[in-house]
């Protein structure tokens, strides 16, 4: 797999979980002899929702909720076959979304 790179993008609501998963991926890739760039923290997406507290009147009284989506990006440069196999067998927590692209 010469002159290729694997781009991994992680998304999660909990920043501790995403940092732990990123560290696990970096350790696995380095153990197999690949060069890792990252993890690079991408901007956190904040979705805010305003909900009326009362079902009838009092429009000025609202509850505010938000969901924060944390993201990390990392590149694995010149991965070996060992690296790909190790990443396939890696078990990450359920709250982390992983997108892998081969470039």
Curated annotation (Swiss-Prot):
Subunit structure: Part of the 30S ribosomal subunit.
Gene3D superfamilies reported for this sequence: Ribosomal protein S10 domain (3.30.70.600)
Protein name: Small ribosomal subunit protein uS10
Alphabetized UniProt keyword annotations: Ribonucleoprotein, Ribosomal protein
Protein's job: Involved in the binding of tRNA to the ribosomes.
NCBIfam families: PRK00596.1, rpsJ_bact
GO CC annotations on file: ribonucleoprotein complex; ribosome
One Gene Ontology term from the biological process aspect of the record: translation
Species for this entry: Bordetella petrii (strain ATCC BAA-461 / DSM 12804 / CCUG 43448)
One annotated GO molecular function: tRNA binding
Family: Belongs to the universal ribosomal protein uS10 family.
InterPro entries, A to Z: Ribosomal_uS10, Ribosomal_uS10_CS, Ribosomal_uS10_dom, Ribosomal_uS10_dom_sf
């Amino acid at each position: 797999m010469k002159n290729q790179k694997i781009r991994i993008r992680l998304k999660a609501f909990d920043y501790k979980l995403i940092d732990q998963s990123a560290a696990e991926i970096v350790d696995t890739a380095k153990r197999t002899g690949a060069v890792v760039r990252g993890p690079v923290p991408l901007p956190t997406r904040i979705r805010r929702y305003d909900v009326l507290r009362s079902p009838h009147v009092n429009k000025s009284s609202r509850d505010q909720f938000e969901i924060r989506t944390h993201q990390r990006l990392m590149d694995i440069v010149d991965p070996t076959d060992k690296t790909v196999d190790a990443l396939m067998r890696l078990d990450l927590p359920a709250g982390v979304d992983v997108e892998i692209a081969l470039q």
